[in-house]
Curated annotation (Swiss-Prot):
Function: Allows the formation of correctly charged Gln-tRNA(Gln) through the transamidation of misacylated Glu-tRNA(Gln) in organisms which lack glutaminyl-tRNA synthetase. The reaction takes place in the presence of glutamine and ATP through an activated gamma-phospho-Glu-tRNA(Gln).
Keywords per UniProt: ATP-binding, Ligase, Nucleotide-binding, Protein biosynthesis
Active site: K79, S154, S178
Iron-sulfur is among the record's keywords: no
EC number assigned by the record: 6.3.5.7
Name under which the protein is recorded: Glutamyl-tRNA(Gln) amidotransferase subunit A
């Protein structure tokens, strides 16, 4: 029995019924990872010993008749910018290469409380800055559907690991599309929750007003289970919301009667790949067949999201990354005498080119004379975009768009085309700017490469997104198809 081919919810049921042991499940994923990750590059660190030790402890509890909760020993992979006590937390950067986290992020504490087993730390774009996972300081991540193509980013390791069956569930981080975009390109489900739904405590910051922990799974049910486990208020995160967390599994039903889905014309422009357009149109027909009402709508300000995003995110990044200086912690150049020289050289050698580029851009937009001209204006645009979404979401329950206007491109294809690379998140950034929940659902293939559609919902209505996504899955098998490795 190939346990790595099972979904997380199938594994939970099998462990509950004592059909398999937790240790067997963990060993299956370790063996799978050791067999294929040399091709994929999804893992930066595999925590074999601690995972097997925890699996044995859980098996002993089950044998004693104790009822577990939550994940029942199902393994989870963690993006390497989320703190796990005793494990590396490099952000895929040379400057944090030897940094070991002394504490658990809130999401990790909640995983452990709900019997999730941490299997390792997953590769990413350095400090979550990138859309292709070509910016990792250690190694690139390859798309399981075509090893010569990118998996998307910045959570490319998290999505590629799930797609290649190296892990059933994973956590990524979202700033402008870093879970949804690679989820679409790798053919898995990826959720960005409402800003404030999931605690950011223990996540190394990129842009504090945009960052969120996202969940990734093989299907909507897996994603819903993981999201429920880690959601909820956290007093250690000042942006955490005091909003009750529903039982997301109860929202999973095929019937969409009464659900209104908006179709914004601004997301279906001429530059959208025709084969992707066809897949989205087919998905819409299925949702209609399942009872949903499709309504044409307009989000005229969405086109300004990308510009506002790259001003706001780089400004916040330049401030957040100032603390990584080689003096308090991080890689340190010890051959220099002056603190200023140590600071400059440590950061110059420790940060990659993309990170340095964004720090400089962010410093510029916050400088005298530019703050009002760029940063304040971007904040005003952000407010207008939020109001635009609020207007539409009074008339519909969710909005459907493509997740990405292209499928996975080849390595090096866009590295020298900055605008082309930055536009990779064109369809995901609007929801991030507005702080809304959004999910990517696999909906087909274009020339053998996965395609996904995006659902955007109202604040704290992840349940509706799960409902629509689940309904679609009940009429299709795209989420079940596995890449041949």
């Amino acid at each position: 029995m190939e346990l790595f081919n099972k979904t997380a919810h199938e594994l939970i049921d099998m462990i509950k019924s004592k059909e398999v042991k937790v240790e067997e499940v963990v060993k299956s994923y370790i063996a799978r990872t050791e067999c294929i990750d040399e091709k994929i590059g999804a893992y930066l660190y595999l925590s074999k010993e601690s995972a097997l030790k925890e699996a044995k402890l859980l098996d002993e509890k089950i044998q004693r008749g104790e009822k577990l909760k939550g994940l029942w020993g199902v393994p989870v992979g963690i993006k390497d910018n989320i703190s796990v006590s005793g494990m590396q937390n490099t952000c895929a950067s040379k400057i944090l290469e030897n940094y070991i986290s002394p504490y658990d992020a809130t999401v990790i504490s909640r995983l452990k409380e709900n019997n999730g087993i941490i299997l390792g730390k997953l590769n990413m774009d350095e400090f979550a800055m990138g859309s292709s996972n070509e910016n990792s300081a250690f190694k690139i991540v390859r798309n399981p559907w075509d090893l010569e193509r990118i998996p998307g980013g910045s959570s490319g390791g998290s999505t590629a690991a799930v797609a290649s069956r190296e892990i059933p569930l994973s956590l990524g981080s979202e700033t402008g599309g870093s879970v949804r975009q690679p989820a679409a390109l790798c053919g898995v489900v990826g959720l960005k929750p409402t800003y404030g739904r999931i605690s950011r405590y223990g996540v190394i910051s990129f842009a504090s007003t945009l960052d969120q922990v996202g969940t990734i799974g093989r299907d909507v049910t897996d994603c819903a289970i993981l999201t429920e486990v880690i959601s909820g208020f956290d007093k250690r995160d000042s942006t955490s919301a005091r909003v009750a967390v529903p039982n997301y599994k109860e929202s999973l039903k095929k019937d969409l009667t009464g659900i209104r889905i908006g179709l914004p014309k601004e997301f279906f422009k001429e530059d959208l790949d025709e084969s992707i357009r066809k897949q989205i149109e087919d998905a819409i027909k299925i949702l209609e067949k399942n009872g949903a009402e499709i309504k044409i709508c307009s989000l005229p300000l969405a086109e300004y999201s990308l510009s506002a995003y790259y001003i706001i995110s780089t400004a916040e990044a330049s401030s957040n990354l100032a603390r990584i200086d080689g003096i308090r912690y991080g890689r340190r150049i010890n051959t220099l005498d002056k603190h200023e020289d140590i600071y400059i050289q440590s950061r110059n050698e420790g940060f990659g080119e993309e990170v340095k580029k964004r720090i400089m851009l962010g410093t510029y937009v916050l400088s005298k004379g530019c703050y009002e001209k760029y940063y304040e204006k971007a904040l005003k645009v952000r407010t207008l975009i939020k109001e635009d979404f609020k207007r539409v979401l009074k008339e519909v329950d969710a909005i459907i768009t493509p997740t990405s206007k292209v499928t996975a491109f080849k390595f090096g294809e866009r590295t020298k085309e900055v605008l082309s690379m930055y536009s990779s998140d064109e369809y995901t950034v609007p929801a991030s700017i507005a702080g809304l929940p959004a999910i990517s659902i696999p909906c087909g293939f274009s020339k053998g490469l996965p395609v996904g559609f995006q659902l955007i919902g109202d604040y704290f209505r992840e349940d509706i997104l799960f409902n629509i996504g689940y309904s679609y899955e009940q009429s299709t098998d795209f989420h079940k198809i596995m890449a041949k490795l």
